[in-house]
């Protein structure tokens, strides 16, 4: 817990990070369904014999092409089956961390027997929705998750309703940390990062520990598109310079390679996404190492990166047509700029240049190619920092970038929240037609 003597705003900042920056094993959309299945299985009277599931179009989009850790298989059906047969119902985003070889074999057998189905929920007004219903004979249990990857809103069995989340807020209840964060500014976040006691934010160093381990695993070249390992190999061949810029890209993309390729190591996520957590963490770690930063300086830079990423992503739908590795990299740009320079002006210029650079990148579902987008975003972040250090940036006279960084962020998020909704539908239609 944090120091209760901190001012209330800073306490809410820390709570926001603690809520949004969590370990996650496997891509979080399939994992959300696996969690629903695991919780349902825990309520079922008897072993699971059949699994039915329904998900929102956006969750389907992010579950079609991603490998489920430990299985070597892609997609939502294996996630649902393994969650039901080997999931830890109390582990949240690490629901599959205890899955045994036998559970994986049983899940694959259940799939092969045609006992697992995953469909799009229709109609569905929720961006993030997953429902799993498990059966043992005529007995069943059903769990629904809505709004957040672990936000269970309803549990029901053949005997009746077990749990329903109350929608109303009790009188006098404090606003959520994210609600408070939505009314803050980057300048206030920077003041917090500069002045908060180190002991209150030391926990953020865990993001470096987890994501560095994932990056090291990715450099083995066994996972996903092995972008990080390939680029490292090209450095050895003399086709790519061995410098800070390449190290940022290599180590960041390697973590995403391992993440999307199904490595059985957790990522420290941000805003419900492992890739966002990786993108907000690894560039900052690499730059901190380059400058010999101590733990306190690294923690402050990571806190700025993660909190800025949460602040920006909080203005977006939880899932959208905008690749959120780009917004996480805006947080990384802030953290790297702080390490090198520390000035608000440098940080705001770097974020503005990011918005002018990679804001059009679409999300076409979770897959190994996410590591490509992560590498692009990390590279753009460092480029934006280098420009800002030379007092240059995309200005308010260009495109959607405004003269004020807060308005630039608002403009980007308005595009993703409104105009890009049709883009999202088109992406889902294209992906669904390929899956037939």
Swiss-Prot record:
Belongs to the UPF0597 family. One of its GO terms (biological process) is L-cysteine catabolic process to pyruvate. It comes from Escherichia coli (strain 55989 / EAEC). GO terms for molecular function: L-cysteine desulfhydrase activity. This is UPF0597 protein YhaM. Transmembrane segments: none annotated. InterPro entries: Ser_deHydtase-like_asu, UPF0597.
